[in-house]
Amino acid sequence: MTPEQLIALDQQHVWHPYASMDNPPPTYPVVSANGVRLTLADGQEIIDGMASWWCTVHGYNHPHLNEAMHLQIDNMSHVMFGGITHEPAVTLAKRLVDLTPAGLDKVFFADSGSVAVEVAIKMALQYWHSKAQPNKNRMLTIRNGYHGDTFGAMAVCDPINGMHSLFASVLPQHHFVDAPPMGFDRPMEEGDLTELEDKMREHQHGIAA
């Protein structure tokens, strides 16, 4: 299949993320990836500065990761985690716990950042429900954040001013404050967290996390 044929079929049958179905942006066929570079069908190399949406922080085609994947897929590619376990998952969980502060002793595996946010929200809601305080069911977060594209994650991404404003009328309502102004070029100052502290006090009986 030529690159031109591939692009034509792509435009016919693939709906890319964050792209219009009727007027999609250009797509670039990739034939290989190594380190931080993607090789296109025409031989051009480009740097993937986004690390495949932050998923390839160690680079593409990393020999250690490739070896681990080959070894694993020779045994099994995947099994459900409900009522079943296996050594790689248990070993990874133990290594993660060893890296975290005392008291964080359990690991819940999720398949994406959005799902991780969904699960975290559900954990907070379930915690307060178990404490007989189901009214604590709102999140407190900063405006203009990005936490994912699933339903619960969109609700804490500033649905009014952010990229998910189309869904604002049907998303759960949460509490938002402006992001503190300190940054890499400005140290934290007294008062930077005043709005956050005020909002926490104002809605303390309804905030889950």
Model-identified regions with their sequence ranges:
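A structural motif shared across PLP-dependent enzymes of the aminotransferase-like
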Residues: 29-39, 54-71, 82-94, 155
